[in-house]
Amino acid sequence: MGGDFQRRLVLLFGLLSLPCAAEPPGIWLDVPFVKQERNGCGAASVAMVMQYWQRQRGKVADASSDARQVQRALYAKKAHGIYASDLGRYLEQHGFRTFAFHGEWSDLSQHLENGRPLIVALKPDANSVALHYVVVAGIDAKRSLVFVNDPAERKLREHEWSDFRREWNATDDWTLLAVPREGASSAP
């Protein structure tokens, strides 16, 4: 009986010493995950970034950062989603400064190192005009990985850099940075 207990104890300590796979290596931010509704990836991505900044400032998420509200405010039937320019406009109206640009790996690294998640547009299907917005929440340069909060799937979805780059390049590497405007009363 004593030997059985010792084997279990050794096994337990052995398991506890294994590296934890819950957190990806490299740089990553704990951006809240918001699941999208139909054609709601843009709204969910805006909500994730707004909620991230509200949490950073110790505030509770408010109605403006609710994905359903963003979707109601911005959804365009013709686009079957939200236009990129409207994402930035909504964030501006709610206390953020926004910067849309053609991103590169160095931009992902720089902004994540400074605690700033990015919204990017991807084009998963080259034969479709549909875009898909995700939030870049982490990278691992050593393993050439990008981690995104994909509102259609899950938090910290792993992409090989080459696959991510192909889908991102199809949108001309569209990237949106949103940072709280200092002193804005409606800023999170």
Task: Label the predicted regions.
Residues 97-149:
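Active-site-adjacent substructure of cysteine-protease-like catalytic cores
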Residues 70-105, 109-118:
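Mid-length scaffold segments of soluble, non-membrane domains
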Residues 26, 79, 113, 117, ...:
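Noncatalytic regulatory segments and standalone regulatory/sensor domains
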Residues 2-6, 18-80, 84, 105, ...:
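Active-site-adjacent structural segments surrounding the nucleophilic cysteine of cysteine proteases
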Residues 9-12:
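N-terminal export leaders
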Residues 23, 89-92, 167-169:
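Short, conserved catalytic or adaptor-binding loops enriched in Gly and charged residues
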